[in-house]
UniProtKB/Swiss-Prot annotation:
Component of chylomicrons, very low-density lipoproteins (VLDL), low-density lipoproteins (LDL), and high-density lipoproteins (HDL) in plasma. Plays an important role in lipoprotein metabolism as an activator of lipoprotein lipase. Residues 1-22 form the signal peptide. Belongs to the apolipoprotein C2 family. GO terms for molecular function: lipase inhibitor activity; lipid binding; lipoprotein lipase activator activity; molecular function activator activity; phospholipase activator activity; phospholipase binding. This is Apolipoprotein C-II. Residues 75-97 are annotated as: Lipoprotein lipase cofactor. The lineage of its organism: Eukaryota, Metazoa, Chordata, Craniata, Vertebrata. InterPro entries: Apo-CII, ApoC-II_dom_sf. GO terms for biological process: cholesterol efflux; chylomicron remnant clearance; high-density lipoprotein particle clearance; lipid catabolic process; lipoprotein catabolic process; lipoprotein transport; negative regulation of cholesterol transport; negative regulation of lipid metabolic process.
Length: 97
């Protein structure tokens, strides 16, 4: 649900941020209202990002980070090995030896 909310919020901000190409209106009050709404949405978005960043910093665990880094290095080493084996097999198949 959280990702859907952020996607909907992102799309709403994208729509509000883009200007619609059409006939020009003489009413300057509507653009001021749109600017105010957009400004409030951006301030809400920035405060939500800051709160998420603070929460991440509070819950940051070095042991989990070390495990993730170790898992990444092991999996990338395994992928390098398997890619080398695949390349050797492919070259052997193409050469016909």
């Amino acid at each position: 649900m959280g990702s859907r909310f952020f996607l909907a919020l992102f799309l709403a901000l994208l729509v509000l941020g883009n200007e619609v190409q059409g006939t020009e209106e003489d009413d300057p009050g509507s653009s001021a209202l749109l600017d105010t709404v957009q400004e409030h949405l951006f301030s809400y978005w920035n405060s939500a990002k800051a709160a998420a960043g603070e929460l991440y910093q509070k819950t940051y665990l070095t042991s989990v980070d070390e495990k993730l880094r170790d898992m990444y290095s092991k999996s990338s080493a395994a992928m390098t090995t398997y890619a080398g084996i695949f390349t050797d097999q492919l070259l052997t198949l193409l050469k016909g030896e």
